Amino acid sequence: MLNRVRSAVAHLVSSSGTSSQRSKSPDLPKAISPPPGALETPKSPGTKSGNEIPAPQKTAETPVSFSRPTFLQLSPGGLRRADDHVGRAVQSPPDTGRRLPWSTGYAEVINAGKSRHNEDQACCEVVYVESRRSITGVSREPSHNQGFSFYYWGLFDGHAGGGAAEMASRLLHRHIREQLKDLVEILQDPLPPPLCLPSTPGTPGVSSPSQLVSPQSWSPQKEVTHDSLVVGAIENAFQLMDEQMARERRGHLVEGGCCALVVVYLLGKMYVANAGDSRAIIVRNGEIIPMSREFTPETERQRLQLLGFLKPELLGSEFTHLEFPRRVQPKELGQRMLYRDQNMTGWAYKKIELEDLRFPLVCGEGKKARVMATIGVTRGLGDHNLKVCSSTLPIKPFLSCFPEVRVYDLTQYEHCPDDVLVLGTDGLWDVTNDSEVAATVDRVLSTYEPNDPSRYTALAQALVLGARGIPRDRGWRLPNNKLGSGDDISVFVIPLGGPGSSYS
């Protein structure tokens, strides 16, 4: 009964169209309020109006969109079940014989009422890249060098609305494809990449990309690998996606922002790109191999502090780039207190000055850490309208859209059917550690035949169910009676043994 009341309240609050009502809505970036002592100090963002930050303003006639990944093939009734905060039914692609590319497993579940809809999105595609044919500038008969395909998986964890996550799930792989078009022939050529490409198509007499600028003619020259070209293409694609969101955020209602975790399989290698707090791990013969790391105010403290130090105008008169063990009080002026700045991993003492009474740029610990008392992730896409509560200070300058990309060479190992790459949004990792995921991998896959492609969907479902928990009087609980995840949870399980059946 309590869950039904919570769901009804969340529905009523989230459906409001005015900005004043949205500022109290639960579907906003996680925020913390300054301590009570802030009332005695220069104004800080959390002391102006309420504890939450306002979501991007909407007009009353703005429709609230709700969609799920197309590969789930949900009927209208299925969409309603997927949107039910009370039942929280796990969703997976139907077992109709047409499975996801590479026999990928997928499962998701909606949150327990923190936002009106599931703000996670997912994408799984096989993408063909055709050469621009402007590299060599000569016409050739069709050949295998004219293009290649890559496998693509993406998880997008939205916040302050699902618009950014939905847009990224539809378009990011297209940006990656565009960035790879110039590299089709280069990546299939065993010679080192050329230093320069021709500025205009139609370079006569050139039959190979390696002949455009001979590496031997430039000495010394940095060695550039094919891997680094793919990494650069993915990084550029993220930036272009973010720029597109900035341009179209009004006309296309690109609300909020999203963390992005993407995997590209190309020419024998997995490229895992992460911007946000979603994570990926490989479980190989019982061994756990992290393939990403979280980007939070804690993990990126020094980058944030350096930017605040170099551009103090971004902090206004409200924030300090320095970090203290706790909020500095006016009575402590002139005393020496522990602090650290952008260059420090340890702590030292400094004399407290008036500027130190400002609210810290990075505050809180663990999952409660925030940038400018507002948002708990430091990389991702979107958030172009995000500002400090009751302030004109934008937060976007401190948020990076560039991912960290890690490369895993599948050809270097013999993989068995139980070796998998697990991708999960933070709804999974908030309550499940790497060892528990690995144990679930072993437990679930051992009950299926190695050639049964449904085993990976079953594993994804088990991981989601394990993080969600079961409903009890005091909410969703794990078997140890600890709180289950109340967040949206999305999981991909990718077998490392090779491509499976794909959609026709």
From Swiss-Prot:
User: Spans of biased composition, class Low complexity?
Assistant: 14-23, 197-217
Could you tell me which InterPro entries the record lists for this protein? PP2C, PPM-type-like_dom_sf, PPM-type_phosphatase-like_dom
- Which CDD domains does the UniProt record give? PP2Cc
Q: Name one GO biological process term.
A: signal transduction
Q: Where is the composition biased (Polar residues)?
A: 59-73
The organism sits in which domain of life? Eukaryota
Q: GO MF annotations for this entry?
A: [pyruvate dehydrogenase (acetyl-transferring)]-phosphatase activity; protein serine/threonine phosphatase activity
Going by the UniProt record, its keywords in alphabetical order are: Hydrolase, Phosphoprotein, Protein phosphatase
Q: Which residues carry this modification: Phosphoserine?
A: S65, S75
- Cellular component aspect of the GO annotation: mitochondrion
What reaction does this catalyse? O-phospho-L-seryl-[protein] + H2O = L-seryl-[protein] + phosphate; O-phospho-L-threonyl-[protein] + H2O = L-threonyl-[protein] + phosphate
- Phosphothreonine-modified residues are T41
The residues covered by the PPM-type phosphatase domain are: 103-496
The EC number(s) given in the record are: 3.1.3.16
Segments of this protein annotated with the region Disordered = 1-102, 194-217
**Subunit structure, briefly?**
Interacts with UBE2I/UBC9.
Which protein family is it in?
Answer: Belongs to the PP2C family.
> Known PANTHER family for this protein?
PROTEIN PHOSPHATASE 1J, PROTEIN PHOSPHATASE 2C
| Protein name, per record | Protein phosphatase 1J
Q: Which organism's genome codes for this protein? A: Rattus norvegicus
